[in-house]
């Protein structure tokens, strides 16, 4: 994912990449050069309505995205994958109901059918709102892509599950995107409140860097 594309496409979300660890990457942009992906990340606050999916599909075709990561999908088990489908994309989803009782939430990934990928069941088994896939790259080691959603109101157990999933993903080359609801972290200075320091430690200890320098919100 090129940095410019990242800045223009993110909507109040976060993107982290594993770089400078054992020589795997020299720059964040090396990831996109390896597997030629362009990622759109958004907090949809429901992708259930047909009108939203039609608008999303048009936007994706216009800008040539190959991976779409969505938080707050608001999907439920009574909505089939066929109803949520986008032309030319494979859908991977996890509804909130798979984790706990409650409305809203949920995450999903749309991956271009031109990319070879599989769901990472060991990571998807963690009881948190996250979805993980592995992109198959012929020339180098495969890349893990994950989307995470941390609700402003989240249990300690669910938060630990999410952090554990991220730690496991960090053993591989990976991109992690999502909405983590940590608005008080200063990514330039790493200053944060006591409530946020565990997440900052997680990012730093696993050699992630923030790949999002700016974002926009669309109503």
Where do the PLM segments sit?
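A shared catalytic/ligand-binding motif for oxyanion handling
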Residues: 1-219
């Amino acid at each position: 994912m090129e940095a410019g594309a990242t800045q223009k496409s993110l909507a109040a979300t976060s993107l982290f990449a594993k770089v400078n660890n054992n020589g795997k990457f020299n720059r964040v942009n090396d990831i996109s050069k390896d597997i030629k992906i362009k990622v759109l990340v958004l907090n949809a606050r429901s992708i259930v309505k047909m009108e939203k999916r039609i608008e999303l599909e048009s936007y994706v075709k216009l800008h040539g995205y190959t991976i779409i990561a969505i938080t707050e999908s608001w999907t439920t088990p009574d909505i089939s994958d066929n109803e949520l489908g986008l032309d030319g994309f494979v859908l991977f989803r996890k509804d909130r109901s798979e984790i706990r009782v409650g409305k809203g939430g949920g995450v999903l990934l749309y991956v271009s059918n031109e990319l070879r990928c599989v769901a990472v069941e060991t990571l998807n088994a963690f009881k948190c709102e996250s979805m993980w896939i592995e992109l198959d790259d012929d020339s180098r080691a495969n890349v893990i892509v994950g989307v995470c959603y941390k609700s402003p109101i989240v249990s300690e157990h669910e938060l630990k599950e999410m952090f554990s999933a991220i730690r496991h993903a960090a053993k591989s080359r990976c991109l992690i995107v999502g909405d983590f609801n940590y608005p008080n972290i200063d990514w330039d200075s790493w200053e944060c409140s006591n409530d946020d320091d565990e997440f900052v430690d997680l990012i730093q200890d696993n050699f992630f860097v923030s790949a999002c320098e700016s974002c926009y919100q669309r109503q």
